Amino acid sequence: MKALVINGPNLNMLGIREPGIYGSDNYDRLVQICKEAGAAQGFDEVEVFQSNHEGSIVDKIQEAYGKVDGIVINPAAYTHTSVAILDALKAVAIPAVEVHISAVETREDFRQVSYARLACFATITGEGLQGYAHALELLKEYLDR
């Protein structure tokens, strides 16, 4: 079983960008958490992808069709703006979990809208990087049904 973890803009700057909100761990640590959590859940492979470009994220979702069993996605800023990412998730119809490091629901008004959420069966917010481990756990439970 294969999982794909997709990270949007600025997540490559973890540990540098607003550590009071996103923590002090860097992106390499996030990748490590995803790989370890995926293995613990019984995934044969966890691919972790990051891009600052909306089209690259859409391309990656489309390329996943027929190749991955589930997606964990943190669209980051594109959460609140990207119908293209929503449409790509709907097009491939791969089970997906939305994850956010911070509790976006307690932040600025513009962060209250999530287009990606409309194509996801669950959303995890405010658990820091461990939210990815939780998302992979939910994904595995969903796939095992």
Model-derived regions: residue spans:
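Short, acidic/small-residue loops that bind anionic groups at enzyme active sites
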Residues: 90-107
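Extreme N-terminal starter segment of soluble prokaryotic enzymes
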Residues: 1-4
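Short, glycine-/small-residue-rich phosphate/pyrophosphate-handling segment
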Residues: 48, 106-145
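Glycine- and acidic-residue-enriched helix-capping/strand-helix junction motifs
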Residues: 14-28
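Short beta->alpha junction loops
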Residues: 47-55
